[in-house]
Amino acid sequence: MTDKPKQYVKEMFFRPQHLHFTGIGGIGMSGIAEVLLNLGYQISGSDVKLSPITERLAAMGARVFEGHAASNIAGARALVVSSAVDEQNPEVQEARRISIPVIPRGELLAELMRLKYGIAVAGSHGKTTTTSMAATILNYAGLDPTVVVGGRVGTMGGSNARVGHSDFLVVESDESDGSFLKLAPIIAVVTNVDREHLDHYPDLDAIRAAFLEFVNKVPFYGAVIVCLDDANVQGLLPEIRRRTITYGTTAQADMEAGDISCGPFASEFRLRYRTADLGRFRLHIPGRHNVLNAMAAIAVAMELEVKPDTIREALETFSGVDRRFQLRGQERGIAVVDDYGHHPTEIRATLDGARQCGFRRIHVLFQPHRYTRTFHLMDEFARSFHQADSLFVMDIYAASEKPIPGVTAESLVERIRQFGHRGVEYVGTLDRGVDALVAAASEGDLVLTLGAGSVYQAGEKVLERLRTEGKG
């Protein structure tokens, strides 16, 4: 018998209409916009600056405006906003004036999931890579999921979204503003829990409570997949009320990785799942943290009855995610890599992975991201760079935040020195950072740009300088 009420709701939701996205160039907003474009919606949007992301959406049929203005939302049935958009935005004010709904991004994502079998990946770090791996495996296995992820994925044609024709939806959730609590997945993944987004959460206990609420929203027939290597995740286990699958590098985990080896831009490991030896798996990305990310994705796939050999083949096709230890190029024997890492835990994991690749020396250009994060995690940042032979620090990328007195790149550099790093230097600007990297690097070295702001622009500049100056 047809489920007529559910079918009616689907038809009502997927009836094409005009939605406007304020901040459409954001990685999270653009993914949902792309999915809705492919479902036949009329999409418009605006952002402060146009970008390759907005150009892609425009080529797909979206109408994109540079800058925010009340006139941009003419004809829209609803306004979609990210947590970065406040009530003073002229488009929000116009939406209030003409009485059309203002929908948070997380709420719209939850509506998409309500009509699908949702797999949601959460965690303080590793979400994008884990989500991308899970999506790659499920698509390779023929499950044809719809996907929304916070990074551009090679196996998805360089996009951060895809529309599948099955009832599966794979999403990267967003704990930064608590919006992941709107989701109701049948499978929930937690990669780790850390002190992050302290502009939203008062303390670590509040963060832990939010993740616990998230996993306990899974229905009784669903599953929770968590990393047993993470101490804060271990602390959640006694209070998780749903069927739980653990993964990690300990024999206590349901899924255990062993015999881990990492080389230049690759990792291998042997996998045990309960009593079964699943054999060796190979990744084209380095680092123990990426082995853990892969294990979470493998656990999702096995929960959906994908065969181990299919999973192994799918992971061989996965080349990584944009800005996640991404090789930008090599010149004169010097590798230039870019990474989005902007939290101390991410930085340590990235540098540990880089060190395992066998480079002679590692030179880092780091751009701190947000004054609040730098303030709350100053000492953690100061402990995070000891695997870097030289470290050059740019000014803080504000990300719309107002400065905090005494919280500067210079104060961070001084704190890093106090914690024992002898090769740290304040450079301030991108161009001075490029100068410092070119002067420091020699054959066999790694140049690594780190941060969530504009620091990625340094990579191509370094490569061009190495080409033209014959540095080596």
UniProtKB/Swiss-Prot annotation:
Pathway: Cell wall biogenesis; peptidoglycan biosynthesis. InterPro entries: Mur-like_cat_sf, Mur_ligase_C, Mur_ligase_C_dom_sf, Mur_ligase_cen, Mur_ligase_N, MurCDEF_pg_biosynth, UDP-N-AcMur_Ala_ligase_MurC. One of its GO terms (molecular function) is ATP binding. It is an enzyme of class 6 (ligase). One of its GO terms (biological process) is cell wall organization. Keywords: ATP-binding, Cell cycle, Cell division, Cell shape, Cell wall biogenesis/degradation, Cytoplasm, Ligase, Nucleotide-binding, Peptidoglycan synthesis. One of its GO terms (cellular component) is cytoplasm. The keyword Cell wall biogenesis/degradation applies. It is found in: Cytoplasm. Cell wall formation. This is UDP-N-acetylmuramate--L-alanine ligase. It comes from Solibacter usitatus (strain Ellin6076).
